[in-house]
């Protein structure tokens, strides 16, 4: 079985780590973690993140610490920025494998669970990108895995390890790091073993999580009271009811895209598990249902919010695929998903005129048919699509992102960081990282002497360099790619020295 697992693990490792450090820091979100972690290493202040000279308390410090560790090992660069996020992504897949094997007793279901999670589009995208989402999902999954092991094996120390993992989730993304695993455990026990909830250790454990993670929130409240309260209420309270209002069914639709390549099959699997009353799947069913319903009720909805439910979704889907039920429905769905992925890869290659680079992937796409492993069709299609994306499309995109060059030129003009540096007309969030300084923005007056990077027409000066730079968010990646092709939202920026 270990050989089979390695055969599955190796291509996943390729997808997660190949060209990982090739692309410059993405805008806007990745820039916050890149620059703040860099500042932590420079200043030695690891409790209060500082981005572009300003305190940033939107998220607790765990993600910044993870990036800082990467910088320590690999240097302050893009590989260091993303390495441990990719590694935690793989580890989340391994935990899903172990949990699926424990729950179902099937090695094939466990392998499929690992594949389904690891190849999920939004999951792998976030694993190759520095943000709190994958570390948060990892710690939630670790907490629930350890608790389930405690509950089934009755080993006390696993219970307390589960609480430590939950504390780390809180230090990654706030109170949800405790609320989500605690809610899953509570409702599962309510269904299966309500007397377990009477044990005092669950309430002592709640206090333990509060002590292990609450110290950072208390520290920020005491030191930066106003800034902390404003951000804490916005991030943890207003998102529930005030910031934006998305429809209740948002995630029911979003799963069809975000959980590709096995997305449609999940709904069949969910229906099958409930109809057949698959008792062994009660834990992942409660896990998915609780997270899905909680975030469906929350007014502000973002696809990554339900990513902590993905391991449970992967296990449910894998067990369905490994069963003998609804074979015709499964096979038709698998072929349909494979076809969608093949057509998407082909469309991408033709649109960007890279069709020749697609030929080596054709045998890979057809391999499941020869092996008669139809459950692997979406996995092979996803591998081809994602490998094509990381080996061809991402390097192509990088030629339209000269941020390293812009930062290098600014450092060359002012190596000692003695001049004020401005950006006018737009703010590129990764510029503080590459220029290695505070970038002044939203100003009505430029104080001389200074370096100014200005959108053409926003400031009159004699440029020493010019670049075409993108003037929108890169987080909607396929929109960004279309803008590159159509040459939209790119503007000329002038770099000037004002004396």
Curated annotation (Swiss-Prot):
Topology class, membrane: Multi-pass membrane protein
What are the cysteine partners in each disulfide bond? none
Transmembrane stretches, start-end: 5-25, 79-99, 110-130, 132-152, 170-190, 203-223, 252-272, 286-306, 332-352, 354-374, 377-397
Q: Please provide the record's keywords in A-Z order.
A: Cell membrane, Glycosyltransferase, Membrane, Transferase, Transmembrane, Transmembrane helix
Q: Name one GO biological process term.
A: response to iron(III) ion
PANTHER family tied to this protein: MANNOSYLTRANSFERASE YKCB-RELATED, UNDECAPRENYL PHOSPHATE-ALPHA-4-AMINO-4-DEOXY-L-ARABINOSE ARABINOSYL TRANSFERASE
| EC numbers for this chain | 2.-.-.-
The protein here is known as: Uncharacterized protein aq_1220
Q: Which organism is it from?
A: Aquifex aeolicus (strain VF5)
Q: Which InterPro entries match?
A: Glyco_trans_39/83 (IPR003342), LipidA_mod_glycosyltrf_83 (IPR050297)
Task: Quote the subcellular location field of this record.
Answer: Cell membrane
- Judged by the first EC level, this protein's enzyme class is transferase
GO cellular component entries: plasma membrane
Top-rank taxon of the source lineage equals Bacteria
